[in-house]
């Protein structure tokens, strides 16, 4: 696909996706170190695994952008979210995952609207991955008695997103 064939808004979605994924990498990496300092090595390892998964998403986005003939450029990263305990950190992560889910849902719907099947499928695959992450976070929060209950599996189904 040539760059001139890609809708400018799709390029915007890709750039924002890269920023959000790199924000997630930064957040999970920082939290892995933080909970390690707290002595919770099991949680630190889980955060390291999340870091790798989000880094893989960022790499997929970079590769996709390059395949479109676009130089990858993330915009500004969000600051790392802090909390005084593991449940608080997980709730902050759930908020970030929700941003990713909303973004990929909106991007895939826009691609459907303009009949861009290739980019729509790309965003839909990332959406599915992030919904899975969201369900994992929800389960971890429930294990710890967390306060949030989210419907990640159902997010985006039957919802209208303004495009």
Where are these regions (language model features)?
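Iron-associated oxidoreductase/ferritin-like identity signal
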Residues: 1-163
């Amino acid at each position: 696909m040539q760059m001139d064939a890609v809708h400018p808004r799709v390029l915007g979605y890709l750039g924002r996706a890269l920023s959000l994924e790199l924000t997630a990498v930064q957040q999970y990496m920082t939290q892995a170190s933080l909970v390690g300092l707290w002595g919770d090595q099991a949680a630190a390892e889980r955060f390291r695994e999340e870091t790798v998964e989000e880094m893989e998403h960022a790499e997929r986005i970079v590769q996709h952008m390059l395949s479109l003939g676009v130089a990858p450029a993330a915009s500004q990263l969000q600051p790392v979210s802090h909390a005084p305990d593991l449940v608080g950190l997980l709730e902050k992560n759930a908020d970030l995952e929700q941003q990713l889910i909303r973004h990929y849902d909106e991007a895939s719907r826009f691609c459907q609207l303009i009949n861009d099947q290739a980019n729509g499928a790309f965003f839909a695959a990332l959406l599915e991955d992030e919904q899975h992450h969201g369900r994992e976070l929800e389960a971890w929060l429930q294990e710890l008695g967390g306060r949030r209950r989210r419907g990640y599996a159902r997010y985006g189904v039957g919802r209208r997103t303004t495009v």
